[in-house]
Amino acid sequence: MSLSIDVTSLPSISSSVYKNESSSTTSTISGKSIGRSEQYISPDAEAFNKYMLSKSPEDIGPSDSASNDPLTSFSIRSNAVKTNADAGVSMDSSAQSRPSSDIGYDQMDFSLNKGIKIDATVDSSISISTTSQKEKSKQENKNKYKKCYPKIEAESDSDDYILDDSDSDDGKCKNCKYKKKYFALRLRMKQVAMQLIKDL
């Protein structure tokens, strides 16, 4: 950020190398007085320019230019209207305090407004099972009565095994006419499966 100042437009600018005078004027912030040593200079713009140009930019500080301080810059502008060029303009405020209600004094009041925004978000997840009791019991019964088929063995396809009464379900399907066809089909499927396994 760059700040350019036209010193010729100011009635007078204070510096520590010029004449010192005292004043009781202060600038207040929120009703509090700021006390610093008051400094004045004569309205000789050429002398001030010469002094400022003789210093390197690194050595120039707030004591060399009143405009570097925002509070003092405001004080210069307000006092320049109320005083003439011969009286000088205050660079810094004095150690004395003054009532903020006096007419004719400059006063700056700063108010800080804080905006607080609260954004509260609550996320909830509820899982509800809508399975009816009837469907649940049906599924349990299905799993309960799931038939476990016996392991297929090589000798299970023999004629003796097919005609054996142990394969019948309580005599309901004893030596059924479809039993031989079933075991023949099962033997063929087993051979195909074994051939696929060999090919892999």
Swiss-Prot record:
Biased composition (Low complexity): 22-37
UniProt-listed InterPro entries: Rotavirus_A/C_NSP5 (IPR002512)
Polar residues bias (residue ranges): 91-100
Requisite cofactors: Mg(2+)
GO molecular function: ATP hydrolysis activity; magnesium ion binding; nucleotide binding; RNA binding
Pfam hit, one: Rota_NS26
Subcellular location: Host cytoplasm
BP-aspect Gene Ontology terms: viral genome replication
Gene Ontology cellular-component annotations: host cell cytoplasm
Disulphide bridges: none
Residues reported in the UniProt entry to bind Mg(2+): 92
Stretches for region Disordered: 13-38, 53-72, 85-106
Modification after translation, per record: O-glycosylated.
UniProtKB keywords: Glycoprotein, Host cytoplasm, Magnesium, Metal-binding, Nucleotide-binding, Phosphoprotein, RNA-binding
Span of the signal peptide: none
Phosphoserine sites (modified residues): 67, 156, 158, 166, 168
Subunit structure: Homodimer. Interacts with VP1. Interacts with VP2. Interacts with NSP2; this interaction leads to up-regulation of NSP5 hyperphosphorylation and formation of virus factories. Interacts with NSP6. Participates in the selective exclusion of host proteins from stress granules (SG) and P bodies (PB). Also participates in the sequestration of these remodeled organelles in viral factories.
Function description: Plays an essential role in the viral genome replication. Participates, together with NSP2, in the formation of viral factories (viroplasms), which are large inclusions in the host cytoplasm where replication intermediates are assembled and viral RNA replication takes place. Orchestrates the recruitment of viroplasmic proteins such as capsid proteins to these factories. Participates in the selective exclusion of host proteins from stress granules (SG) and P bodies (PB). Also participates in the sequestration of these remodeled organelles in viral factories.
Family: Belongs to the rotavirus NSP5 family.
Protein name, as recorded: Non-structural protein 5
